[in-house]
């Protein structure tokens, strides 16, 4: 669990080779923003949405993060290098910044609760 830290920002997304598509989800203590685009089709995002985050949502996200576990992960795949897809998660605040990149759809046991929340939010914004 992360202690309540208003400077914490969680970013996640996916990117696929051949301009097939990419998205990003940016979560802070006040806002959730989602952008999805298919670079091969247009420079204009197909989806660009944002909404305020509730205190309950923010607390659930903070409770889903074991920061020590996350900081110890060293995933750095490059499926996009061979026209595949990669997923990424970055966590940053005033004191730390760490990012992992892994094969799209892979569940990592030590961060699965966070991955589940990110997946739910992504589904909400894509519909």
Predicted regions and their residues:
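Primarily extracytoplasmic ectodomains and periplasmic/lumenal surface modules that are beta-strand-rich
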Residues: 32-33, 70
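Short, solvent-exposed coil/turn segments at beta-strand boundaries
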Residues: 26-32, 94
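Short, solvent-exposed loop/hinge segments that bridge or flank secondary-structure elements
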Residues: 18-28
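Short glycine/serine/proline-enriched coil/turn segments at secondary-structure junctions
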Residues: 16-19, 41
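Short, well-ordered, aromatic-rich surface patches in folded extracellular/luminal domains
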Residues: 1-17, 51, 59-62, 68-127
């Amino acid at each position: 669990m992360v202690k309540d830290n208003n400077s914490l920002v969680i970013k996640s997304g996916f990117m696929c080779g051949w301009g097939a598509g990419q998205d990003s989800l940016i979560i802070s203590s006040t806002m959730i923003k989602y952008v999805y685009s298919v670079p091969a089709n247009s420079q204009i995002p197909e989806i660009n949405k944002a909404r305020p985050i509730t205190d309950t949502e923010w607390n659930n996200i903070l409770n889903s993060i074991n920061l020590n576990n996350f900081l110890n992960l060293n995933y750095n795949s490059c499926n996009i290098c061979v026209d595949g897809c990669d997923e990424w998660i970055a966590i940053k605040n005033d004191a730390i910044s760490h990012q992992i990149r892994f094969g799209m759809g892979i569940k990592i046991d030590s961060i699965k609760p966070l991955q589940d929340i990110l997946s739910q939010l992504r589904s909400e914004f894509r519909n």
